[in-house]
């Protein structure tokens, strides 16, 4: 796996973004950028420089599930790996994320 891949971390809670960033850094992934919701993430994604997306589900503006659907509907972004890191632990939500095309789902 390319340790220089550019990873976008999307979460409205800055402490959670920092925790994820630190965990990634500990694994050797230091090329990260941040956004506080789906709406602010889209321009970053559209820049074409992101290799991996980590997103929360519950955020103001555009939620993580809506961001995931946006990514999967976009011809240039649809193959982007997406990991959802969220407090949403209900079976229905995990199924919804899987059906929307998430690559991984971690309950925080």
Q: What are these regions, as identified by a protein language model?
A:
Residues 14-33:
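Two-component/phosphorelay signaling modules centered on CheY-like receiver
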Residues 21-22, 66, 89-104:
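Alpha4 helix (beta4-alpha4-beta5 surface) of REC/receiver domains from two-component response regulators
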Residues 34-52:
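Acidic, metal-coordinating helix/loop segments flanking the phosphotransfer/catalytic sites
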Residues 37-40, 63-69:
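Acidic catalytic/metal-coordinating carboxylates
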Residues 54-56:
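Active-site T/S-Asp motif of two-component receiver
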Residues 59:
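Receiver (REC) domain active-site loop signature in two-component systems and cognate sites
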Residues 70, 108:
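A Lys-centered signature of the CheY-like receiver
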